[in-house]
């Protein structure tokens, strides 16, 4: 099973979720596009937290900007056809960059590029002012593309807002993230253990 981790925005917990799922599903990891933090990339973080095999990025940029902007600064021409799924027999966790409809190449959106692959999707939403609106808009865009959505992971939401989102979106609840002062291998393993029961039924969760 290949799963794409999409977020309602940047910095909503996608890398943390990716590390947890590589442990839970004994999966490999791939981030197609890395912008900025090349010495402390998301692939390096996931590997350190989970020990998972991490496939090389298709593109690596020196500045933490939208891909098309970062590519321009680094004088790199991006080609959609070079962003291809790694060959592996293992399950694969694929992490997007930024929000679902973040720019990819100069004339494409990330969600449209990744939507071509035969993968399931998980949406990650983090609580902040405006996050419910961003969650509903992102889900609307995903459903408009007829994506196979497994469900949603909610990061630091109060219980009443969790209930509202789940009731309104109709998405299966796949896990909850709490505020963590620091994240370690033990933290990741603890979440993998907590989420085990829900993810046992992942094949029946599609919506």
UniProtKB/Swiss-Prot annotation:
EC number: 6.3.3.3
Residues the record lists as binding substrate: 35
Catalysis performed (reactions): (7R,8S)-7,8-diammoniononanoate + CO2 + ATP = (4R,5S)-dethiobiotin + ADP + phosphate + 3 H(+)
Keyword match Ligase: yes
SUPFAM superfamilies: P-loop containing nucleoside triphosphate hydrolases (SSF52540)
Keywords attached to this entry: ATP-binding, Biotin biosynthesis, Cytoplasm, Ligase, Magnesium, Metal-binding, Nucleotide-binding
Family assignment from sequence similarity: Belongs to the dethiobiotin synthetase family.
Taxonomic superkingdom: Bacteria
Subunit structure, interactors included: Homodimer.
Compartments in which it is found: Cytoplasm
Protein name: ATP-dependent dethiobiotin synthetase BioD
HAMAP family the UniProt entry points to: BioD
Listed cofactors: Mg(2+)
Binding annotation for Mg(2+): 15, 42, 95
InterPro entries (alphabetical): DTB_synth_BioD, P-loop_NTPase
Function: Catalyzes a mechanistically unusual reaction, the ATP-dependent insertion of CO2 between the N7 and N8 nitrogen atoms of 7,8-diaminopelargonic acid (DAPA, also called 7,8-diammoniononanoate) to form a ureido ring.
A GO CC annotation given for this chain: cytosol
Source organism (scientific name): Chlamydia abortus (strain DSM 27085 / S26/3) (Chlamydophila abortus)
Biological process per Gene Ontology, one example term: biotin biosynthetic process
Residues that, per the record, bind ATP: 11-16, 42, 95-98, 155-156
Higher taxonomy: Bacteria, Pseudomonadati, Chlamydiota, Chlamydiia, Chlamydiales
Pathway(s) the chain acts in: Cofactor biosynthesis; biotin biosynthesis; biotin from 7,8-diaminononanoate: step 1/2
Gene Ontology terms, MF aspect: ATP binding; dethiobiotin synthase activity; magnesium ion binding
Annotated active site: 31
PANTHER family reported in the protein's UniProt record: ATP-DEPENDENT DETHIOBIOTIN SYNTHETASE BIOD 2, DETHIOBIOTIN SYNTHETASE
